[in-house]
Amino acid sequence: MLRPTLIFPEGAALARGREVVASTDATALTVENLRAAYRRGIFPWPGGVTAPIPWCCPRVRAVLVFDELTPGRTLEKAARKSGWSYSIDRAFPAVIAACAAASRPEQEGTWISPAVLEAYTALHRAGQAHSVEVWQGEDLVGGLYGVDAGGFFGGESMFHRVDNASKLAIWFLATYLRERGQAWMDIQQLTPHLARLGAREVTRAVFLAGLAKELGAGRELFPPRQDPTQ
């Protein structure tokens, strides 16, 4: 199967251009295209299993600045009393599958089609997609996954099976990233769930300038994968 290599706009052309910079089918969801897209602040935004996939750089972008994170007393209490444990990349396939299966009132169905699941699993094997897991004993009760664009991590999707589990996954991740020098993360779209944690929207120009600065820091956020086949 021929898999196209996409050429994405960047710099001023991207900052002043349209929100949808390309439209493809699922064959374009390659590790190489995903790497190139995320480094430019672009992400695929599938609308369904068979629909064309738009590659987007929205004019308004949601971000979570870690110094503005407001967990609130309820979440702080849950963190103290839950007895849950947290991990990174322990169960990426289970996390992305749970995100795909999660029911979301604001959308019909899921954008995480089998092709998307396969593409981001390949990106995980390549060391650039990562997961956070929340465990209640041996049970996976929440988590999220996202993409490391090369020293800057952005979230893609999250899920919870127990109240507060996805929020605590974000809180754990924010602490982890802040300890490694990252000050904020891309969350793409603002939802009420994330707004309650302190997330907000910025313009595309502000986002792209911040992304360039973060990528220029040359950080290594995650250790190399020990087994790239998993």
List the predicted regions and their residue ranges.
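N-acyltransferase acceptor-side catalytic subdomain
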Residues: 1-230
